């Protein structure tokens, strides 16, 4: 098993137990055409309008029971034609890895242009204990490499890409229909508001903070963007308010003595 998958599947659940770092939304249908699937500590997101559904992220590699989750939310993954990936980490991009079963077999994949360097093995994903660790996800050729501020119209659904490098170099957020923000792993949110995502998992924390400042400014200064909901990778779904960006100059912190989110599950990986 490749190291990043081994860490995600076998190690992460043990070292993170009791630290309450994540509070993903439960699998289900929410307001504003939003649906999600929970896979342990992470969410896959969906947005539906006028019979058209787009997906944001693909979750883990070969995640057991994902078929039942799709049935629960009433979405057929084979009918999804477009999936927007926030970044190429194993818990967000594993579901379309060529080494496993592609949960969106008929979808065009969209991914931040700079993520290609991780997929190609040209750069490492993180350094731990002096060891450079590469991403191990591989996806099929033909994905669309997104630039900042690209705009798409898919069956009447408007999608705007916002480049937010830091967690990874090609990390990308998506604003959908000017009212839903999908943040991937640039934000961690608790009852006090939003923080820059945890340094432990973020490749360039200072860069991530700068990206969040730019993202907030874009939202504040663009009249047609009227956010209603924020959908995160690991903090669930939140109604948009000023607290979402309240602490973006600080990195989120977690420990057993001082959990990040008191409302989060003690063990996010229990099924």
Protein language model features and the residues they cover:
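C-terminal regulatory/interaction regions
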Residues: 2-11, 260-271
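Metallo-beta-lactamase
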Residues: 13-17, 23-24, 61, 113-165, 169-243, 247
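Conserved beta-strand hairpin/beta-sheet module of binuclear metal-dependent hydrolase folds
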Residues: 19-73, 173-184, 188-190
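Hydrophobic/aromatic beta-strand patches that form the interior of the parallel beta-sheet core
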Residues: 35, 84, 110, 144-146, ...
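Short catalytic-loop micro-motif centered on adjacent basic/acidic residues
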Residues: 54-57, 83-84, 161-163
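Short amphipathic alpha-helical segments
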Residues: 67-68, 96-98, 123-124, 177, ...
């Amino acid at each position: 098993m490749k190291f990043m998958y081994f860490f995600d599947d076998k190690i992460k659940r043990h070292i993170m137990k009791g630290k309450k770092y994540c509070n993903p939304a439960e699998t289900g249908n929410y307001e504003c055409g939003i649906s999600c699937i929970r896979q342990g500590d992470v969410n896959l997101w969906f947005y539906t309008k006028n019979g058209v559904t787009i997906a944001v992220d693909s979750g883990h590699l070969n995640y057991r029971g994902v078929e039942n989750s799709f049935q629960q939310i009433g979405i057929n993954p084979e009918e999804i034609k477009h999936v927007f990936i926030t970044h190429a980490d194993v818990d967000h991009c594993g579901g379309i890895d060529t080494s496993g079963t592609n949960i969106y077999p008929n979808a065009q994949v969209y991914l931040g242009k700079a993520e290609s360097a991780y997929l190609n093995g040209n750069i490492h994903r993180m350094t731990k204990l002096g060891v450079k660790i590469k991403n191990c996800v591989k996806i099929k050729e033909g994905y669309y490499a997104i630039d900042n501020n690209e705009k798409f119209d898919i069956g009447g659904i408007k999608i705007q890409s916002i480049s937010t490098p830091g967690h990874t170099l090609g990390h990308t957020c998506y604003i959908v229909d000017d009212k839903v923000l999908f943040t991937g792993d640039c934000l961690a949110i608790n009852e006090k508001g939003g923080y820059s995502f945890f340094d432990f998992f973020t490749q360039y924390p200072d860069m991530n903070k700068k990206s969040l400042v730019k993202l907030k400014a874009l939202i504040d200064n663009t009249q047609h963007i009227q956010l209603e909901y924020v959908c995160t990778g690991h903090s669930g779904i939140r109604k948009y308010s000023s607290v979402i960006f309240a602490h973006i100059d600080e990195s989120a912190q977690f420990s057993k003595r001082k959990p990040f989110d008191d409302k989060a599950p003690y063990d996010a990986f229990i099924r």
